[in-house]
């Protein structure tokens, strides 16, 4: 792998990523996916560096994926558990981060229920001249960059397994359906998919898809559309991304019932008939079977890319950690 291919910086949002930067990540992830296919699934790219996974919010896929990615790169890992940490004794989040910094941490992967926490920690590190890099692993309803990047990688690899690149999506239609209001995944995917040139259609109930989401479209003219009915979004779609109803983030009763939601916006075989032949389904997980997607569709290998998304996540997160670490070590 070439050296110095990336200017090391924090990854907090995809809002200002360029197509070139997306392609660097896709190409780097492709190299690491090849590594993961070997008998010895480990390279010394980050040997001697320390990655701290600071997850202030519960996570299964993202936390384990980042931990495994770091270990596959030979980094040392520190894993934070809020229930057994000094937070229970009144320590601030910033002081917790500074403690990990004092232990020699080179990169911090941070998840928090409140938007802006990773950015605040990154800003504090910069103000004090520390070289540690911060990667946003999901902050409130703001963004989840690594999830959107693994979604992008999964789609592009399907379109070209040897040379995935963002330009492959220029003629594609992608529907994002569900609880978009509370979804940090949706926000990051809006940035990445519209940057690719894809036509992105959002669909959800008016309570879960406020009209202001159309404002994103002003930054990417004629590439983002908002629908309060599912049919226009699915019509001739090449990919359908369905999102979990995040009941834990809902401050009020936004839906009459889960059954009615499934009737109106659930992905079923009948609804997929509106899409292009060969349509594929994505979901960031965890999935509420029978709510946002019919259980049989989730398990159908001809339609579902959900397992591939989880697998892709390791290679993509290896790429992100490698690039944040300087991209200088030989594999």
UniProtKB/Swiss-Prot annotation:
GO terms for cellular component: cytosol. One of its GO terms (biological process) is 'de novo' pyrimidine nucleobase biosynthetic process. It is an enzyme of class 2 (transferase). The gene is pyrB. Pfam families: OTCace, OTCace_N. Heterododecamer (2C3:3R2) of six catalytic PyrB chains organized as two trimers (C3), and six regulatory PyrI chains organized as three dimers (R2). L-aspartate binds at residues 89, 184, 244. Signal peptide: none annotated. NCBIfam families: asp_carb_tr (TIGR00670), PRK00856.1 (NF002032). It comes from the Bacteria. Belongs to the aspartate/ornithine carbamoyltransferase superfamily. ATCase family. It catalyses: carbamoyl phosphate + L-aspartate = N-carbamoyl-L-aspartate + phosphate + H(+). This is Aspartate carbamoyltransferase catalytic subunit. Its EC number is 2.1.3.2. HAMAP family: Asp_carb_tr. The keyword Transferase applies. Catalyzes the condensation of carbamoyl phosphate and aspartate to form carbamoyl aspartate and inorganic phosphate, the committed step in the de novo pyrimidine nucleotide biosynthesis pathway. GO terms for molecular function: amino acid binding; aspartate carbamoyltransferase activity. Carbamoyl phosphate binds at residues 61-62, 111, 144, 147, 285-286. Keywords: Pyrimidine biosynthesis, Transferase. It comes from Trichodesmium erythraeum (strain IMS101). Pathway: Pyrimidine metabolism; UMP biosynthesis via de novo pathway; (S)-dihydroorotate from bicarbonate: step 2/3.
């Amino acid at each position: 792998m070439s050296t110095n291919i990336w200017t090391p910086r924090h990854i907090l949002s995809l809002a200002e990523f360029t197509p070139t930067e997306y392609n660097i990540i896709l190409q780097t992830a492709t190299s690491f996916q090849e590594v993961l296919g070997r008998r010895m699934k480990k390279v010394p790219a980050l040997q001697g560096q320390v990655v701290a996974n600071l997850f202030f919010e519960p996570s299964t896929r993202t936390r384990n994926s980042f931990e495994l990615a770091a270990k596959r790169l030979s980094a040392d890992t520190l894993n934070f558990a809020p229930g057994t940490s000094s937070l229970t004794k009144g320590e601030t989040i910033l002081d917790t981060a500074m403690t990990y910094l004092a232990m020699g941490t080179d990169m911090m992967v941070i998840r928090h229920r409140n938007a802006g926490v990773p950015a605040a920690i990154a800003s504090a590190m910069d103000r004090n001249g520390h070289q540690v890099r911060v990667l946003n692993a999901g902050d409130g309803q703001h963004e989840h960059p690594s999830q959107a990047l693994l979604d992008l990688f999964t789609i592009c690899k399907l379109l070209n397994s040897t040379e995935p690149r963002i330009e492959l999506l220029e003629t594609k239609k992608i529907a994002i359906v569900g609880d978009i209001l509370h979804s940090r995944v949706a926000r990051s995917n809006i940035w990445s998919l519209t940057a690719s040139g894809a036509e992105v259609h959002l669909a959800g109930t008016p309570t879960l898809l406020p009209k202001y989401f159309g404002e994103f479209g002003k930054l990417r003219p004629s590439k983002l559309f908002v629908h309060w009915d599912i049919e226009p979004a699915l019509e001739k779609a090449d990919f359908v991304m369905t999102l979990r109803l995040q009941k834990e983030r809902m401050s009020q009763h936004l839906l009459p019932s889960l059954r009615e939601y499934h009737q109106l916006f659930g992905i079923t075989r009948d609804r997929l008939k509106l899409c292009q032949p060969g349509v594929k389904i994505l979901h960031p997980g965890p999935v509420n079977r029978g709510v946002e997607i019919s259980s049989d569709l989730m398990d159908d290998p001809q339609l579902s890319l959900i397992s591939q998304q989880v697998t892709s996540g390791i290679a993509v997160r290896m790429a992100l950690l490698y690039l944040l670490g300087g991209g200088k070590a030989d594999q």
